[in-house]
UniProtKB/Swiss-Prot annotation:
Gene name in the database record: bioB
Cofactor, free-text remark: Binds 1 [4Fe-4S] cluster. The cluster is coordinated with 3 cysteines and an exchangeable S-adenosyl-L-methionine.
Residue intervals of the Radical SAM core domain: 63-288
Molecular function in Gene Ontology: 2 iron, 2 sulfur cluster binding; 4 iron, 4 sulfur cluster binding; biotin synthase activity; iron ion binding
UniProt lineage: Bacteria, Bacillati, Actinomycetota, Actinomycetes, Mycobacteriales
Gene Ontology biological process terms in this record: biotin biosynthetic process
Protein family according to the UniProt entry: Belongs to the radical SAM superfamily. Biotin synthase family.
Class of the enzyme per the UniProt entry, highest EC level: transferase
UniProt keyword list: 2Fe-2S, 4Fe-4S, Biotin biosynthesis, Iron, Iron-sulfur, Metal-binding, S-adenosyl-L-methionine, Transferase
Pfam family, one: BATS
Protein name: Biotin synthase
């Protein structure tokens, strides 16, 4: 059978039957076209889809769930115009620029570790780090290492090669830089820098030996076709971790009046991304509380998710850490231990 004939046969077949053979049995992620067909499935097949995504997660990732906490080292005043973000200095947002001191950073790391988390991510609202920020990050990492047994990640915007090398030398375990959305939709979301600039940073991070964390936000006006495109973009990048956020419209931002993504669409997307990325850590991130609520959080963890951010996010409230940990315990999902992630 030719490649074209095989594609036609796959298109004609039921996409979940194809996924069961291709993804569950062979570990090969769905293509962009196949992901689109998953995203187009009706609500009456959602339960079946989530069950398959859970099987894939258990088969290729195992039962453990990685827990992470995040903290904003530098909040607000960002010069970029990411339309979803209340930290941009270009919008009429209530968020104001502020820096966190090192003792507060260390205390946040301690509290994160107490929750059972193995990863602590230091975040800054910047286009990219300047010398002041890099010095503060270096001091913070050293202070945390002296008191807390936890892996450290950073999210500091776009990097130069020299900055990548410096962060690697500091012992940064994982670097987060989200592509945010499909390449074709990105100009509708950000105009002050390009999708390619973000991609270039991610490639340098990987080449330096740090783990790559890259995901985005769903519900920013993208089409289903673009949602499938985004999954394919991520599959090409092959990140170690994909955080999935759902738009929580922020007052004063260009996306402040967008509607929240329906829960069924969000869950379909979670499962579709799992089927596209069978071996990748897929993390519940911002916006899940407003989009999915408590029941949706459970469905997501039983529908492909195998990592969570506990506690609050950068400018919005998250679920209490205790609620997530209790849910994982109820579902008999063990929290990934620090020694198993080294």
């Amino acid at each position: 059978m030719t490649e074209t004939a095989e594609l036609t046969a796959a298109t004609d077949a039921d996409v979940l039957a194809v996924a069961r053979e291709q993804v569950l049995e062979q570990g090969v992620g769905l293509t962009q076209e196949q992901v689109l067909r998953v995203l187009q499935l009706p609500d009456d097949r959602l339960e079946e889809l989530l069950a398959l995504a859970h099987e894939v997660r258990m088969r290729w990732c195992g039962p453990e769930v990685e827990v992470e906490g995040i903290i904003s080292l530098k909040t607000g005043g960002c010069p970029e115009d990411c339309h979803f973000c209340s930290q941009s200095g270009l919008f009429a947002s209530p968020v104001r620029s502020a820096w966190l001191d090192i003792p507060s950073l260390v205390e946040a790391a301690k509290q994160t570790a107490k929750s059972g988390a193995t990863e602590f991510c230091i975040v800054a609202a910047v286009r990219g780090p300047d010398e002041r920020l890099l010095a503060q990050v270096a001091a913070g990492i050293e202070a945390i290492r002296n008191e807390v047994d936890i892996q450290i990640a950073c999210s500091l915007g776009m990097l130069t090669q020299e900055q990548v090398d410096r962060l690697s030398a500091m012992g940064v375990h994982r670097y987060n830089h989200n592509l945010e959305t499909a390449k074709s939709h990105f100009p509708n979301v950000v105009t002050t820098h390009s999708w390619e600039e973000r991609w270039d940073t991610l490639k340098m991070v990987r080449e330096a030996g740090m783990e790559v964390c890259c995901g985005g936000i769903l519900g920013m006006g993208e089409t289903l076709e673009q949602r499938a495109e985004f999954a394919a973009n991520l599959a090409e990048l092959e990140p170690d971790e994909v955080p999935l956020n759902f738009l929580n419209p922020r007052p004063g931002t260009p996306f402040g009046d967008l509607e929240v993504l329906p829960a069924s669409d969000a869950l379909r997307a979670v499962a579709a991304f799992r089927l596209a990325l069978p071996r990748t850590m897929l993390r519940f991130a911002g916006g899940r509380e407003i989009t999915l609520g408590d029941l949706g959080a459970k469905q997501g963890i039983l529908g492909g998710i195998n990592a969570v951010i506990v506690g609050n996010y950068l400018t919005t409230l998250g679920r209490p850490a205790e609620a997530d940990l209790e849910l994982l315990d109820d579902l008999q999902m063990p929290i990934k231990a620090l020694n198993s992630s080294l």
